[in-house]
């Protein structure tokens, strides 16, 4: 479900606005128009366009029904980059053309424009180079598989090379993401390429564009009032030493008595991942051989928190407990 704001400014535009509310009804829609054109109870009176657009710039999509100039002037103070901007599009009031303006790929504006165009019998005006040339788009691929793009610059370099019909090598360490057919298209003669793309949660050379899946889960523990920076540095160092990209972390787990531990909460916040906690009963119920500590067992009721917390979150423990300065970590992968 998407959060979508729709703006219209004329009588014809308001009629199309209502049509779009019905077409996109599976989403969370907020519809705005001038007070004199409110023809549906679902509409909200548009009093201040600039303030309303600003309030919706964290939405998934913004649709303007009217002139392109109105849309551009309305959004210009808030535009940042294609990785954070919402999908923004313009539709003329007669519903003839649907024009994506921002976030055609990452934000999904092109895809939404195609969908709306089909629904109202309008022509989507797609201007993205990779789309109109039928070229593999890194950002579209990454979005489809929920992958993190390691370098925006390298992503641009890859797109530019493909548009210039230069070969690019691509491989995947992830069984579920098969790129064999894509590899044949991007590098049909299997030559050594200057530009390489790798779908992986491992750390590669800085000149390789990695597309990183959220495939890693960690379990952690620490003594009370551990310094937050010390905790983050510890986790960073462990990941670097074992060649795992820290951006691949999907969630962090620990025992429930640590739910308010500042160091772990700050770690989760800095990595933008959820912090999950489990009771001692849940942790003790996990089967397997673990690096147990009698001191920890007497203190919290579980002989090993981090390894057990990993295996509640995922299937496989790939790195057993590592301890330093009252902190522990274990790592798993789906």
Write out the residue ranges for each language-model feature.
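General small-molecule cofactor/ligand-binding pocket signal
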Residues: 30-32, 125, 274-278
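Extreme N-terminal starter segment of soluble prokaryotic enzymes
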Residues: 1-6
